């Protein structure tokens, strides 16, 4: 997480965040509907915090990589806002869904306009928007994530992406329904391929914490074309990516 607490220190991390959160680490289970995720060790626990004062605190397996799945939707939204501005909201809403993140029923009732960018339907529409704008979307998306996190070793996990493609029937249904309501411009298989790659991108807690610093330090706005590893240097109108 990117935080702005002047008094934050390693002792606070250990005594508050770790003690409060670690007991919940054994609750729940992996997403077994994606075979490649079902076999991940569930006993790993890591935490990393970067402050906007350039302090870093880590605990446990903070540098262990994992596929970020729906966290990728934040990066997609930042890119789409940079490219589309307020026009984005003509295709995706801003409201809580009130239903499951992968609901087909709500999407049908609302004629193919997803409630928000963070449910699967909204993320799939954003994927379509990126395909419309970017000449080399997979490469440009990865370049953005590498740039904002300052780690050029970040990569797509092809095994996870393939596992999702082979078992992503509900996401395929969502994409077909979006296409039916004319809210998808590109080929369905092309959209799904890129969407599953985004979800598969592999980062660590350290990488993610670093990547979200520009969002925490929102006085310095940015676009996907203007990121450097050093937080003070961003370029864009502030309203774009807040």
Explain the meaning of each model-derived region.
Residues 21-59:
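A short, well-structured edge-of-sheet supersecondary motif
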Residues 63-65:
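A short acidic/small-residue loop/turn micro-motif
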Residues 10, 68-74, 119-123, 168-171, ...:
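Short alpha-helical patches at coil-to-helix transitions and adjacent helical residues
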Residues 201, 221-242:
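A penicillin-recognizing enzyme superfamily signal
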Residues 74, 78, 202-220:
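Active-site-proximal alpha-helical segments within enzyme catalytic domains
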Residues 2-28, 80-198:
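Active-site-adjacent helix/loop patches that line small-molecule binding or acyl-intermediate pockets
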Residues 54, 67-86, 211:
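Active-site SXXK
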Residues 128, 176, 210-213, 239:
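Generic alpha-helical structural context detector
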């Amino acid at each position: 997480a990117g935080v702005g607490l002047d008094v934050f220190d390693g002792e606070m991390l250990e005594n508050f965040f770790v003690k409060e959160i670690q007991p919940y680490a054994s609750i729940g289970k992996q997403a077994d509907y994606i075979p490649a995720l079902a076999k991940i060790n569930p006993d790993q626990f890591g935490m990393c915090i970067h402050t906007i004062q350039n302090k870093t605190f880590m605990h446990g397996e903070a540098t262990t990589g994992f596929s970020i799945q729906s966290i990728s939707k934040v990066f997609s939204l930042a890119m789409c806002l940079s490219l589309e501005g307020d026009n984005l909201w003509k295709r995706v809403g801003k409201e809580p869904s009130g239903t499951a993140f992968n609901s087909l029923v709500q999407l049908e009732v609302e004629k193919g306009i997803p409630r928000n960018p963070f449910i699967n339907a909204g993320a799939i529409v954003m994927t379509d928007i990126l395909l419309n704008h970017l000449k080399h979307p997979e490469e440009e998306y990865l370049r953005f994530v590498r740039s904002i996190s300052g780690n050029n070793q970040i990569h797509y996990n092809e095994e996870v992406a393939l596992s999702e493609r082979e078992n992503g029937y509900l996401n395929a249904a969502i994409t077909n329904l979006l296409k039916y309501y004319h809210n998808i411009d590109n080929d369905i298989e092309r959209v799904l391929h890129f969407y599953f790659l985004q979800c598969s991108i592999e980062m660590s807690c350290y990488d993610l914490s670093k990547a979200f610093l520009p969002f925490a330090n929102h006085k310095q706005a940015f676009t996907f074309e203007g990121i450097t590893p050093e937080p003070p240097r961003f370029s864009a109108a502030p309203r774009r990516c807040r």
